[in-house]
């Protein structure tokens, strides 16, 4: 089934963030860059939201702390240390796939900072549980936002339905006036325009 104008593609996932971004922070990504070829994508953010906005860079492999820091120093925002920079592995690819079906304002990329670049050491026994706790805490805030979006979309759908019903009535009335006055198509269009506006 093709998505409707009220449907959304939401990518909710984990990412690494610059050290100035606390673990557990939820960010809405306003710029996605695919590091392999440098292509950049801009999801339209047309909705009020409680999140920080950030740039996200998608790498083809996991970034350890050293390579992540080199990337930050060399490429991403080296001049502005306060800039919110995130890295993941999938957002740019999801945007490109979603772009076939969704408009830029229908795609949201919500990322939770779970680390500041991985370490080379093997993961500790509790690290999976710690990751789940971070994502679960962030999910509450994200779900609240998604519920607000859905409420807004339902309201917009009802308004669109009412407008469509009104337009249909106006069209019928314009046709009746055209027939009664033996008017042309141009006259019918003028009657329709005067009724609508």
Predicted regions located by residue number:
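Glycine-rich phosphate- or other oxyanion-binding loops that anchor nucleotides, phosphorylated ligands
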Residues: 1-197
């Amino acid at each position: 089934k093709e998505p409707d104008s009220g449907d959304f593609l939401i990518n909710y996932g984990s990412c690494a963030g610059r050290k100035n971004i606390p673990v557990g922070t939820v960010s809405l990504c306003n710029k996605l860059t695919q590091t392999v070829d440098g292509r950049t994508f801009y999801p339209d953010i047309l909705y009020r939201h409680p999140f920080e906005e950030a740039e996200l860079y998608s790498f083809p492999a996991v970034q350890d702390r050293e390579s992540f820091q080199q990337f930050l120093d060399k490429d991403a925002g080296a001049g502005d240390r306060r800039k919110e920079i995130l890295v993941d592995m999938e957002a740019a690819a999801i945007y490109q796939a979603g772009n076939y079906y969704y408009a830029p304002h229908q795609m949201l990329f919500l990322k939770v900072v779970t680390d500041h670049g991985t370490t080379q050491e093997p993961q500790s026994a509790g690290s999976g549980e710690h990751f789940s706790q971070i994502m679960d805490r962030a999910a509450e805030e994200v779900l609240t936002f998604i519920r607000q979006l859905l409420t807004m979309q339902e309201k917009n759908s009802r308004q669109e339905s009412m407008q469509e019903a009104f337009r249909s009535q106006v069209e019928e009335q314009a046709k009746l006036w055209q027939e009664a006055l033996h008017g042309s198509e141009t006259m019918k269009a003028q009657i329709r325009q005067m009724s609508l506006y």
